[in-house]
């Protein structure tokens, strides 16, 4: 992953991630059918790189307010972040804590809690993640995270499925669940999942995945 070009489609958007040593470019491209630009449906391209965020409309740079740039950046970065997990968890801003092992569907899992330093942790440094890693395969099968919303805290639990390998790199899709009570602990989610007490919100499916070593 450190030196590669990754491309995939997610819902109605195309994503590209270029990484080479210390250089990176995370890109999202899509047609904005809700807007018109000189009587045409515009193609939007959002790019995050070492210099920051930039939006292009029909390949022409468009200045956006700082507040919107933060929102667009977070949206682009979130999809790219989840697409290659657990890659990135050894970054300097990441703090990992090993918790108690748990059983999920009669399989034993290591539990790893992940938090982020404010310095280098990005806009969402207060988010908390939990990873359940199979004790024998060392694969991440389940993920949970909490994040801040305007009206409080949001919680999600993801179940990996559709495992496949592209150029030796593992990719999975996710069933995306939500608990009824957002005040519960992330560590309670595997048991709620086993009981069927989580609500399935959506499926996170990456399509047309290609990976090229740079």
Language model region names:
Residues 23, 32-34, 61-63, 148-149, ...:
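Short, surface-exposed beta-strand-loop junctions and turns on beta-sheet-rich folds
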Residues 2-7, 23-32, 105-113, 140-142, ...:
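Short, hydrophobic/aromatic-rich segments at coil-to-beta transitions
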Residues 14-21, 44-47, 95-103, 131, ...:
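Short, exposed beta-strand/loop patches in secreted or surface proteins that constitute
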Residues 9-11, 19, 27, 56, ...:
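A structural detector for beta-sheet-dominated domains
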Residues 108-211:
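Gly/Pro-enriched, hydrophobic low-complexity segments
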Residues 49-122, 150-151, 213:
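Flexible, processing/modification-adjacent segments and terminal tails
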Residues 9, 37-39, 94, 124-126, ...:
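Short solvent-exposed loop/turn micro-motifs enriched in small/polar/acidic residues
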Residues 1-59:
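N-terminal mature ectodomain segment of secretory-pathway/periplasmic proteins
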